[in-house]
Amino acid sequence: MKQLLCYLPWLLLLSLVVSPFNEARFVVEKNSLSVTSPESIKGTHDSAIGNFGIPQYGGSMAGTVVYPKENQKSCKEFSDFSISFKSQPGALPTFLLVDRGDCFFALKVWNAQKAGASAVLVADNVDEPLITMDTPEEDVSSAKYIENITIPSALVTKGFGEKLKKAISGGDMVNLNLDWREAVPHPDDRVEYELWTNSNDECGVKCDMLMEFVKDFKGAAQILEKGGFTQFRPHYITWYCPHAFTLSRQCKSQCINKGRYCAPDPEQDFSSGYDGKDVVVENLRQLCVYKVANETGKPWVWWDYVTDFQIRCPMKEKKYNKDCAESVIKSLGIDSRKIDKCMGDPDADLDNPVLKEEQDAQVGKGTRGDVTILPTLVVNNRQYRGKLEKSAVLKALCSGFEESTEPAICLSTDMETNECLDNNGGCWQDKSANITACKDTFRGKVCVCPIVDGVRFKGDGYSHCEPSGPGRCTINNGGCWHEERDGHAFSACVDKDSVKCECPPGFKGDGVKKCEDINECKEKKACQCPECSCKNTWGSYECSCSGDLLYMRDHDTCISKTGSQVKSAWAAVWLIMLSLGLAAAGAYLVYKYRLRQYMDSEIRAIMAQYMPLDSQPEVPNHTNDERA
């Protein structure tokens, strides 16, 4: 009976899983595999990326395929057969081809890695579409080696596997390239990714691995998010309880909102410990922490809350509860009232909009398949395959940036090899000015003419780059001739669009490699008057005049210093005197005219008092008339 009770949670979980996914669509994430030799099987094929190890996202790997004569399923250690696959110095890495069957995929890869293989190809033993090689579920013994697998692996179809075996058995050297450069879309300068996680810390090996990853990846995630390089969103898988079982003990203990949102019992024991509904409530709380933090422009606070909750509120210490969660929320300065409002009432017979959105998001759209594996990482709408480990996941994120837009964290020596350090990546460079067209990227390098101090270089980036536009002469003299002597510097750079390099006055040449001084004296270009004495200088000339003469450079002639000074002085004196005379004459004429006018008017006024003037009419004398 006790054994039956142990299986009940799993039977219920199966019913919960199947119900919402009766039309589930699991997408196998693939990478490209190209056979370069022999000619008979040359071509490109698809392979399914294994969900363990470290795929080289954003990169590629070339190697030679080997098919072992013994232990062909790689279920035993190759050391038992005295077989090693370590590459000899100067040789290509070894890609081990093994057969599917008899043991876990991960064990096959682990045994191959210990024998020195650089990658593993697993040939399917069934004619079927490609599937994803996953890790064993809740297997403690396998967990010990799974976390140590560092080489990539891929599943190939049965038909292609047979072709590889035939070529190898025929004595051909089979070389191929594994290419992960297009495994993740890289459309722009921002990567969108999501992590499907769980707050349950008692679900075994995978939960421990997930908790460790969140703790290790927190720093890198927050750097990327704060810099605007990524847009992260957490998700939590939930299922619903079939309507016929909503009143059962199992549904009541594992679900909230009347069976709408459920999670498995952490201890797989309904009579003790925490219930599945406790996990659902905490999952909901963590979703609301992200939502509230995102509304305040600080979505990265989710990482702080989740890691602090793991440390302060573990199930094994009986602290996995609301009180402990609220203490973490308070310590991070998050508004607990907004969290409560977001969570709603878990006992209400209503849809919870936050959890309903999570259930809808589990169903794949476009190129992204349904989320059925926990944990699942989705990068630019493609599910990540491989080890959930900081450097491996960071490589996947970095491969999602458009080339040359990656943040600095993606270009560290731990993440990629700087190809510009080897022969400048084959790009153009100006060693004297320390300028290069090689730009290191996560995928490799690009040759692009640079912008230096605001000056744009133009060219193909490989063999030619030259400064252009305003200010180009400040960069290595625009690639033109330049020389300095005795404190005098000359440059042939001209800030014009039509002319790039032109020797300055006093020089002749192509302006690029050479400008020679013109001997104005010898070539009789200046200082040629009879009284002139010419002396050539670098970039110019000196001209002196005999006697007391002065050289006029603009007119290339000599004039007398003294004569010119005396003439100038007398001219000035006569000019002043003439000006004064004219001023005096003008003043006299004005004065004479005004005075005469004034005197005439005064005399006429006096005379008008005693006698009539010709210009005035006769005035009658009334006094005399009265006397008569």
Swiss-Prot record:
Expressed at low levels in seeds, seedlings, roots, stems, leaves, flowers and siliques. Glycans are attached at residues 148, 294, 434. Its main location: membrane. One of its GO terms (biological process) is protein targeting to vacuole. Gene3D superfamilies: 3.50.30.30, Laminin. Residues 416-466, 469-516, 517-559 form the EGF-like domain. Residues 25-569 are lumenal. Residues 56-168 form the PA domain. Disulfide bonds join 420-438, 427-447, 449-465, 473-493, 480-501, 503-515, 545-558. It is a single-pass type I membrane protein. One of its GO terms (molecular function) is calcium ion binding. A motif (Tyrosine-based internalization motif) lies at residues 610-613. It comes from the Eukaryota. SMART domains: EGF_CA (SM00179). The chain crosses the membrane at residues 570-590. Pfam families: cEGF, PA, VSR_TRX. The tyrosine-based internalization signal may be involved in trafficking at the TGN. Belongs to the VSR (BP-80) family. This is Vacuolar-sorting receptor 4. The lineage of its organism: Eukaryota, Viridiplantae, Streptophyta, Embryophyta, Tracheophyta.
